[in-house]
């Protein structure tokens, strides 16, 4: 059962953006892509490990449109499967060239610990009445961006990049990750439900998102109280709750401000690519992939 649950988790789909970014960063500096495959698999297995444990902490019954491992087999199996996936990630990582292993392990370990720090911040925010934009951006940098940053850094290291180029790619991925998460926040409330993703889940769960935090910072006290309590109003349907909160967002110009921040972070990311020592033609694929992520509709 242990390996069948791991297989179930890995077969669940997803964007595979972390291994893609690792391979694309690697490809900026070399065409010998086979050397990066074990590390690419490692970051994807690690990411899925975090999702297994996230679902336990969030009491989440669904993951990628299917019952979560936690819901299907229970918390004990989900914990054990996640632990095994973490070990599998390290085993895959051990296949990188021996001379690079200490640097890559150091990068991976720092990344993994920062992801845990980000998850703790996210849980702390659930019981915190007021969260600032600065605090939120720091949390999503740890929870989302650093895994992208670790992935591109490891890929670049394996490709023979200089330390300076590795640092630049890390910063590129931090900015891209921030743009990606802010867009996730925006799409949860303003995405197209015809594309198969439910709209308004963050509002109904009372999650601290960039939209909610920005609205709270711009609202008067009566409006802040409405933002806090609308989702709890038993007289309203879920659709009415979502519509009521979105009307406040619209009145406070929150969607435009969020889009502005997404564009700012994304443009910063692309500008960093232009400073790499590699020929611009070799950065084209990672640039196009980044553009596809920020241009998505769900």
Language-model segments: what does each one mean?
Residues 1-298:
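All-alpha prenyltransferase/terpene-synthase fold signal
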